[in-house]
Amino acid sequence: VDHRLKDNDKIVLEGNHILYAIETPGHSLGEISYIFEDAFFIGDSIPVKGDIPIYVDKNKILESLDKIKSTKNEIQYFYPAWDKTYTTENIEKVIKDAEEIVNEIDQAAIIALKENNDVEVTLKRICQILNKPMLEKHPLFIKTVYAHILSEKN
């Protein structure tokens, strides 16, 4: 690594094209996304309905969703790492769905923590509330749940 990128850093490419680095933490703490002309390469920044929500910081993922949403007037295409390409027309709906996922887990965490303060019991109860018992042992989903538990305890 010659240079560690930070928010709004510019990389000048051949032909004077500019690639912008945009910090979008949440899925991982140091996540960087990239804007190139009218395209935003957003990596794993948006939890997607029907997939396992994976992020390590609840507040940061929500901030990153807001940051992505704020670009919708300048960006035509949003390219996630795994899901289909989003457009200006559907990005708000995709982000709204992602916010609902985060809020649903958050509400489950609040309920579970009121019932019991033990982390293991709380994890199991959150999975029950979400009707996703199969995720109880999933190591990456456990990190997502811990992000909510830590947020509620702080």
Predicted regions and their residues:
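Active-site HxH/HxHxD metal-binding segment of metal-dependent hydrolases
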Residues: V1-E14
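Generic low-polarity alpha-helical segments
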Residues: R4, F36, P53-I54, L123, ...
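Short, flexible active-site loop motifs that bind/organize anionic cofactors or intermediates
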Residues: E14, D51, A112
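Metallo-beta-lactamase
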Residues: I18-D106
